[in-house]
């Protein structure tokens, strides 16, 4: 008896309207399923990507968003059970609300981050609401599918989930390959919200128009029209809203900003206390340099590494062209390869006058070759050997960056490093993040290098550290090459003093970082949490 009751519970309504038993109606409903699935996955990806840009720690952001949304989807499915008696109206309302909340989700979270400093609580609430609404879609769509044509529950489930998964595939690919490059995060979410609203219109207007009373249908269509108007108005104002919110996060006027598929790029300009212009580059909110004192950082990063042979040089990272500028000052340099992940960064360094002026057009120097590729992947395929390697990656505050500070990465690097070559690695701050700094040094040593650690002061950064390394057991001397041009900051005395670490910042007991155990990611997230 229990089995019979269960079978009846999942069976389709016994008397589905005959006028809806058409292939066209079924196709349109499955199209709505496809659109809903694609939109749902895009919302999920948009939330995880935004969190990674604004907060970092992509693993945590992804885990929280997915966990909260999957939990909420289960709750939403249960909450939709009482609504199956009026599935057309319920589905239209769910789609309208989901279109509004999902479409505005990126803007709402960006505003919460910029003005309220409440990103994580807001992200959890938005993920919960979006998940509840997505979860309510499936049981309602299942009921509607059975009303079109009665079929076994297993067959209906198979059809529904097949289309659902295909829609998720398309949405997952569409987000990084089309929506982000074409519209950006904020406008992309708004466009997807419009698609979500269209899915509701398909059901109400084209499939079940005869089952919906005139007043109800008019009310639903009016609601959808309001949602579309809200999304459309926000789309028109999106650029101004984004600029206002973004400017609130930076002390100085923004002169350029763009969001690429890899990162958020912002350039600001103000007047320093000396009266000279202060141009600053930020990636995902983290300061990369100030034009007032960047020479201190880049002289320290480049010139000690070129104290040995330096005819053929490799730079990894440094898409702004400033490290390349310093390398090209050496007369002995014949060829430089710069590997930078984001083509938007190197394009900006070439064409945006404030950056081009700083890097002195280095990316267009005939001795320089720019390669836009993932450094880890490029290194696995590289065969040419280099006399010196300059590594200028951002701090390893995400899993994708932590792999570039791993034992495996430095193992690969040895394959392209000449036997007498040297490597310089920017390694963060020994003062603010000592465990991170010494973990990077230990990781390099674990990969078979001898190291020399040193630190400098960069006013816009504070204390900053580097690691000079070469294969073998003999630590490389910290010195300048004979053909070193006249420098503004470095000389022999400064380098000698730079190797002295105070007692409270000397080497500590830390783990090396590997792909399977990214210790440096753990350290950097812990030490930079309060800054």
Curated annotation (Swiss-Prot):
Protein name: Polyamine aminopropyltransferase 1
PABS domain segment(s): 233-471
Lineage, broadest ranks: Bacteria, Bacillati, Actinomycetota, Actinomycetes, Kitasatosporales
Compartment(s) of residence: Cell membrane
The family this protein is said to belong to: Belongs to the spermidine/spermine synthase family.
A Pfam family assignment: Spermine_synth
Binding partners and assembly: Homodimer or homotetramer.
Gene transcribed to yield this protein: speE1
Keyword Transmembrane in annotation: yes
């Amino acid at each position: 008896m229990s089995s019979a009751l269960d079978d009846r519970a999942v069976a389709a309504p016994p008397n589905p309207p005959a006028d809806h038993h058409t292939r066209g109606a079924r196709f349109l409903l499955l199209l709505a399923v496809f659109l809903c699935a694609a939109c749902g996955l895009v919302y999920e990806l948009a939330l995880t990507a935004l969190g990674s840009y604004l907060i970092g720690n992509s693993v945590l952001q992804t885990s929280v968003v997915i966990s909260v949304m999957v939990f909420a989807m289960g709750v939403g499915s249960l909450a939709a059970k009482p609504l199956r008696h009026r599935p057309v109206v319920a589905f239209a309302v769910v789609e309208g609300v989901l279109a509004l909340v999902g479409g505005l989700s990126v803007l709402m979270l960006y505003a919460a981050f910029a003005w309220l400093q409440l990103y994580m609580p807001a992200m959890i609430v938005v993920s919960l609401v979006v998940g509840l609404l997505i979860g309510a879609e499936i049981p309602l769509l299942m009921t509607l599918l059975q009303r079109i044509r009665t079929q076994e529950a297993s067959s209906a489930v198979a059809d529904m989930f097949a289309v659902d998964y295909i829609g998720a595939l398309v949405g997952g690919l569409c987000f990084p390959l089309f929506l982000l490059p074409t519209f950006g995060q904020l406008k992309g979410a708004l466009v997807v919200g419009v698609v979500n609203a269209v899915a509701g219109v398909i059901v109400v207007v084209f499939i079940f128009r005869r089952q919906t009373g005139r007043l109800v249908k008019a009310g639903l269509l009016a609601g959808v029209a309001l949602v579309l108007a809200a999304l459309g108005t926000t789309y028109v104002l999106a650029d101004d809203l984004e600029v206002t919110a973004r400017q609130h996060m930076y002390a100085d006027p923004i002169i350029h900003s763009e969001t690429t598929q890899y990162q958020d790029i912002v350039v600001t300009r103000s007047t320093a206390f000396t009266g000279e212009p202060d141009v600053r580059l930020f990636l995902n909110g983290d300061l990369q340099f100030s034009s007032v004192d960047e020479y201190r950082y880049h002289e320290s990063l480049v010139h000690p590494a070129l104290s040995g042979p330096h005819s053929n040089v490799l730079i990894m990272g440094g898409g702004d062209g400033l490290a390349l500028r310093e390398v090209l000052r050496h007369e002995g340099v014949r060829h430089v390869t710069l590997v930078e992940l984001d083509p938007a960064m190197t394009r900006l360094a070439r064409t945006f006058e404030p950056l081009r002026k700083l890097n002195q057009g280095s990316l267009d120097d005939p001795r320089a070759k720019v390669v836009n590729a993932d450094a880890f992947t490029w290194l696995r395929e590289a065969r040419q050997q280099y006399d010196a390697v300059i590594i200028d990656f951002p701090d390893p505050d995400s899993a994708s960056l932590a792999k570039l500070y791993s034992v495996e990465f430095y193992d690969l690097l040895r394959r392209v490093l000449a036997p007498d070559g040297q490597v310089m690695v920017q390694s963060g701050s020994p003062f603010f993040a000592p465990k991170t700094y010494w973990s990077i040094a230990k990781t390099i040593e674990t990969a078979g290098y001898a190291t020399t650690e040193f630190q400098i002061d960069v006013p816009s950064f504070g204390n900053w550290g580097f690691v000079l390394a070469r294969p073998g057991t003999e630590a490389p001397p910290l010195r300048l090459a004979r053909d070193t041009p006249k420098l503004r900051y470095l000389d022999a005395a400064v380098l000698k003093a730079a190797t002295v670490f105070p007692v409270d910042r000397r080497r500590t007991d830390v783990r090396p970082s590997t792909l399977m155990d990214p210790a440096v990611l753990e350290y950097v997230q812990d030490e930079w949490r309060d800054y």
